[in-house]
Structure formats: structure tokens, C-alpha cells
């Protein structure tokens, strides 16, 4: 049976989702990332771990942080980076996803970093590579539909560990549009695997997916109750591009009911940290006083994201 992520030795072959990824693999990625964080402070920000390797970035959806940090991470590992312009590629002329992959593989690709609107697209690519005896080529999921965003989940775990040191006594709240969020799904799976005892999902009923309670998540529709004594707050934007129908009265009403203000932040523990995967919409899910405040670790998340993505690619490349 095709194993989507691990080889027969239990080593990472692709990174497609955090769901089902063993704790040992997650911790290995986080520990490896720790060794890469300081590279950004060096005069020469490079290590030769992927010299001679070709990394193809295939972003079928828009991205700023993920695409840029993957490119920086690849270059800091000394890989050759090819950014495919999807709008100008043959996929805009009707070429199928797998035909695109086959043609790029013929150019001796070593790794594909893929963001796609369709859930499961990275898995499809990984299976195709396995079926066509190209198991030496690795796939990293940079976000697929509403399904998963594993590197964001991993960098969120790195950030939490950096500031809180230990997962075993934490209460983590995820607030906002959880229904459409691949980040929320990846974070919930990672937090569960790492032993976080209490995960809370906070949002209006229309933006909370079914099945959260079965995953061990406590659900709150009252943000004031949900934020009480939490250690970590992960804010999520409204994903209007994925919404169909009127799920909310307005962005202003959402902020009034669920926006993170200084008053609401005060309900959390005094040393609580505030996170956000971006892009951030000020005045919708978070006010500027909180986003720019001392408890926000939103920009460090971006910095840590480079190291985490370096770790993932380095491990996949066999280092």
C-alpha cells in the first residue's frame, strides 16, 4: 500500500500533512530547525546541504509568506530554485497537473513545493511519482485547499515551543474562520500529537466545522469564555475566497463579536502569546494594538518559518 509520507524505514519521504505524522518525526523537524535559526544572523546566510539539488516551487494559489520563505529556505540550503509562473505556464493552456509534473521531472527536479486550491493535489503528485518510479523526487505540501498546511503547523509548533518551552500544560485557543482553515486543521493535529491537554476552537457556529469535539477540541461560540486563562491564541482571518453563501452579517459584525482586542486579550493568562499565520486583516479579526503589542509573536513566526522549512527540505534531501 502506498505510504504517502514515510519510507519503509519510517523516514520522511514527503511532507503532505501533519495528520498521522509520528511525534518523533515532528520533534526531529523542530530540533533540526533550531540549528538553522541562527543562519539568518550570519554574514553569509548559506549552508551547502542541498547544493546541486533543484527545487521547483509550484504555487497555483497566491502566497506571500509561504512562497517567499520557501525560496529563501531553499537558497540558504544552496539549492537551485525554480519558481514556475503558473499564469504563464502551459497549465493555463490546459496541460494537466501530472503532465506538468512529468515534464518538470524530466528536467531533473529533486523536490516540488506545491500549493494548490484542490485538497489532495500534493498527495496525487506524490503517488504519481511513486507509481512512475520517481521515488527520489520529494513533495512538500505548501497548502492544499481546506485540507492541510503542514509547514505552517510546524512553524506554529516551533513558535509555541520557543516561547512556552513545553506543550504538556498548555491551553491553546484557535479563533476565527476555522471551517475554511487548513492551518487550523494542521495546528489541531500537531497540538494533539505533541500532547497539548486543552485545545479550544472559538468562532460563530457558521464557521466551525463538524467533528471538532470528536477530535478532542472544546468548542466555544462566546469568545470571552473561550479566551479565559489560555496560554496561546492563534487568530485566523476570514477566508472570503472560500466562502459560499452568507455565513456572516459583515466584517464589522465579526470584529465586534470575535475580534481580538486588548480587553479580550486581558482574559487570557498575563504571559499569553498571540499568533497569526497571515495575511492579517486589522480591524476584522485583530486590532492593531494587539497585533503590534508586546504579546504578539506574529513576525517571529515568519522568521522561524524559514528555519522550519529549511529543516523539512534538508531532512527530505537526506541530511
From Swiss-Prot:
PROSITE patterns: CARBAMOYLTRANSFERASE. Its EC number is 2.1.3.2. InterPro entries: Asp/Orn_carbamoyltranf_P-bd, Asp/Orn_carbamoylTrfase, Asp/Orn_carbamoylTrfase_sf, Asp_carbamoyltransf, Asp_carbamoyltransf_Asp/Orn-bd. HAMAP family: Asp_carb_tr. Belongs to the aspartate/ornithine carbamoyltransferase superfamily. ATCase family. Pfam families: OTCace (PF00185), OTCace_N (PF02729). This is Aspartate carbamoyltransferase catalytic subunit. Pathway: Pyrimidine metabolism; UMP biosynthesis via de novo pathway; (S)-dihydroorotate from bicarbonate: step 2/3. PANTHER family: ASPARTATE CARBAMOYLTRANSFERASE, ORNITHINE CARBAMOYLTRANSFERASE, MITOCHONDRIAL. It catalyses: carbamoyl phosphate + L-aspartate = N-carbamoyl-L-aspartate + phosphate + H(+). Catalyzes the condensation of carbamoyl phosphate and aspartate to form carbamoyl aspartate and inorganic phosphate, the committed step in the de novo pyrimidine nucleotide biosynthesis pathway. One of its GO terms (biological process) is 'de novo' UMP biosynthetic process. L-aspartate binds at residues 93, 182, 237. GO terms for molecular function: amino acid binding; aspartate carbamoyltransferase activity. It is an enzyme of class 2 (transferase). Heterododecamer (2C3:3R2) of six catalytic PyrB chains organized as two trimers (C3), and six regulatory PyrI chains organized as three dimers (R2).
Amino acid at each position: 500500500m502506498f505510504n504517502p509520507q514515510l519510507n519503509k524505514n519510517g523516514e520522511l519521504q514527503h511532507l503532505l500533512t501533519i495528520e498521522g505524522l509520528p511525534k518523533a518525526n515532528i520533534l526531529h523537524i523542530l530540533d533540526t530547525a533550531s540549528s538553522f535559526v541562527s543562519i539568518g544572523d550570519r554574514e553569509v546566510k548559506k549552508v551547502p546541504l542541498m547544493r546541486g539539488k533543484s527545487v521547483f516551487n509550484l504555487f497555483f494559489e497566491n502566497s506571500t509568506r509561504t512562497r517567499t520563505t520557501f525560496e529563501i529556505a531553499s537558497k540558504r540550503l544552496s539549492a537551485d530554485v525554480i519558481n514556475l509562473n503558473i499564469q504563464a505556464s502551459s497549465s493555463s493552456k490546459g496541460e494537466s497537473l501530472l503532465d506538468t509534473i512529468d515534464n518538470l521531472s524530466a528536467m531533473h527536479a529533486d523536490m516540488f513545493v506545491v500549493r494548490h486550491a484542490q485538497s489532495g493535489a500534493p498527495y496525487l503528485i506524490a503517488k504519481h511519482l511513486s507509481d512512475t518510479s520517481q521515488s527520489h523526487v520529494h513533495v512538500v505540501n505548501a497548502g492544499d485547499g481546506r485540507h492541510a498546511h503542514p509547514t505552517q503547523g510546524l512553524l506554529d509548533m516551533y513558535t509555541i515551543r520557543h516561547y512556552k518551552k513545553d506543550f504538556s500544560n498548555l491551553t491553546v485557543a484557535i479563533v476565527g474562520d476555522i471551517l475554511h482553515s487548513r492551518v487550523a486543521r494542521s495546528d489541531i493535529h500537531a497540538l494533539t500529537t505533541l500532547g497539548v491537554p486543552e485545545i479550544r476552537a472559538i468562532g460563530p457556529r457558521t464557521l466551525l466545522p463538524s467533528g471538532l469535539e470528536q477530535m478532542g477540541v472544546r468548542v466555544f461560540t462566546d469568545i470571552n469564555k473561550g479566551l479565559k486563562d489560555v496560554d496561546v491564541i492563534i487568530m485566523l482571518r476570514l477566508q472570503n475566497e472560500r466562502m459560499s453563501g452568507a455565513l456572516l452579517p459583515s466584517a464589522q459584525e465579526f470584529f465586534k463579536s470575535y475580534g481580538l482586542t486588548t480587553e479580550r486579550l486581558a482574559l487570557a493568562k498575563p504571559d499569553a502569546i498571540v499568533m497569526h499565520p497571515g495575511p492579517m486583516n486589522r480591524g476584522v479579526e485583530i486590532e492593531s494594538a494587539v497585533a503590534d503589542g508586546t504579546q504578539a509573536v506574529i513576525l517571529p513566526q515568519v522568521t522561524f518559518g524559514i528555519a522550519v522549512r529549511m529543516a523539512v527540505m534538508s531532512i527530505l534531501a537526506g541530511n
